[in-house]
Amino acid sequence: MGSNSSRIGDLPKNQYLKKLSGTESISENDPFWNQLLSFSFPAPTSSTELKLLEEATISVCRSLVENNPRTGNLGALIKVFLSRTKELKLSAECQNHIFIWQTHNALFIICCLLKVFICQMSEEELQLHFTYEEKSPGNYSSDSEDLLEELLCCLMQLITDIPLLDITYEISVEAISTMVVFLSCQLFHKEVLRQSISHKYLMRGPCLPYTSKLVKTLLYNFIRQEKPPPPGAHVFPQQSDGGGLLYGLASGVATGLWTVFTLGGVGSKVAASPELSSPLANQSLLLLLVLANLTDASDAPNPYRQAIMSFKNTQDSSPFPPLIPHAFQINFNSLYTALCEQQTSDQATLLLYTLLHQNSNIRTYMLARTDMENLVLPILEILYHVEERNSHHVYMALIILLILTEDDGFNRSIHEVILKNITWYSERVLTEISLGSLLILVVIRTIQYNMTRTRDKYLHTNCLAALANMSAQFRSLHQYAAQRIISLFSLLSKKHNKVLEQATQSLRGSLSSNDVPLPDYAQDLNVIEEVIRMMLEIINSCLTNSLHHNPNLVYALLYKRDLFEQFRTHPSFQDIMQNIDLVITFFSSRLLQAGAELSVERVLEIIKQGVVALPKDRLKKFPELKFKYVEEEQPEEFFIPYVWSLVYNSAVGLYWNPQDIQLFTMDSD
């Protein structure tokens, strides 16, 4: 580094880095800093190069760790950066490319060093390196600066206050990355951290007043999806001056500095993937999720979560309730549009879940939208391609549907939205179908996939809960959706019979041999019977509440009437079978009277006529099916590892050695 283009492999031998990490103290006013920060660094373009950068940084850090307690050079570098950021806003307004470029380079070095420090040492050691203060002879003051706190406040100020221009885009991304790196101490602990330097600095003291402004800025960065400026927008004039400063950065920018924005961290995702078309938006979203999922401090709730829970629409002129901390306003229409467009990434789906679950203002706004298909369709597409998604992404998508189906208005309106030609649904050509029927099809497909592959009870529960919430409001079900409901019941029935047979054989086997351990078929039977009962309750709920709206379901029920015969006298299902049995018997009688060889159209006509004559008072009333999503106790045990796995896999230009990661296993999704 310094006044030449640098290559990763040369970093440990670089004279400027050697001096920085050496035994000589460097004053913050030394011309050395201008030389160190005037580098054209071809930024890593693959995970291999990011790994090389990490290894080179470790080499420099070893010397720095050894010498910094005596030299204080890390503190001097940070002070140089802090002093420069005071003029950054003015430099942006004056288009001072050189000043911004050097300030960015200072932050880039700090970020690289901080990342290794956090991985390699305890929080106590880290703080010692950031609180060094040179004392003159006879000065016994114990007041030392806390440069880590100053750095964090400065980063928050930079992120929130510096205008986003072509020349400031890069330093804005670097500031967000450095905050992510500061929080990354969680990666190196198996247990969720409940007390750390993150809590110390970000939840109290001078950083706290920036909370709402930071959350708002990160959300707007996500909303705007600003792309990095083209290479030509950031070219510096070539000068050959005797001072050795390198002002000719054109080649470095074109081939290097901007390419950092096409990286996806480990695995190096291709630049064309949607979440990386805007590195600033991607990095902002990851930082926002990390902040929102920090555990509460011992003496105060997480202020970033408070901000996310309470912000309002810019169109809402009502006053904020008293005692609401960190409140702000944001354009809900823009946020809704961005959320609809970005659902291909885990992190955008997790943000949608977080907002729907925690912010009642957002939830009310979304449920009142007349274009809910723009939000629901991307969620259904995630579930449809379940085999290509990780299980966490599928869970989030399902829970979003469950939260939406808690609202009766949503359950009614989705059957009024008619869709044409759903191209991603490949099992059958759907030229025209309601959003409600499509939702049913996709959820049932997810259940069937789970039954044959993952066999996850939690997934089953959420799918069935969403269907149950909707069931009383089923309207004009598409014939294919009606068929799939009964087909799922058929599949469950076959599975029940198979497990019952296995249980019987197992019981016989246990009587003849006491030595061999046998599978717990009784538990399997119990689970499958719970699911069957739930399906019967869903069918019953539709028949008792909206029979006249669903001739296709009655048709499918009659077509497969034999399926239900075995459950009529079963003690677990007798009560719920009464209404289904009544409907089957009533309409079967009508069809019998109409004669044989009836066309599909004629059968549907008889069903529609029969609905009017069916004595509704004979249908037994059951409690309304209503399920509400409730987060499990200690949700942070799920969400914190999940969020950090997203950072690990998706953060732009950040690499961590997988062998150092303690929070989650590398093969987990």
From Swiss-Prot:
- From the record, give the transmembrane residue ranges: none
- Per the record, what is one GO cellular component? cytoplasm
Q: Which InterPro entries match?
A: Dymeclin
Name the gene that codes for it: DYM
Pfam families for this protein:
Dymeclin
Work out whether the entry's keyword set contains Cytoplasm. yes
Quaternary data: Interacts with GOLM1 and PPIB.
Q: Which processes are annotated in GO (biological process)?
A: bone development; Golgi organization
Keywords, A to Z, come to: Cytoplasm, Golgi apparatus, Lipoprotein, Membrane, Myristate
Lipid attachment points (N-myristoyl glycine): G2
User: Known post-translational modifications?
Assistant: Myristoylated in vitro; myristoylation is not essential for protein targeting to Golgi compartment.
At the top level, the lineage of the source is Eukaryota
Provide the topology term for how it sits in the membrane: Lipid-anchor
PANTHER family linked to this entry: DYMECLIN
Query: What does this protein do, in the record's words?
Result: Necessary for correct organization of Golgi apparatus. Involved in bone development.
Protein name from the UniProt record: Dymeclin
Which family does the entry's similarity section mention?
Belongs to the dymeclin family.
Q: Where in the cell is it found?
A: Cytoplasm; Golgi apparatus; Membrane
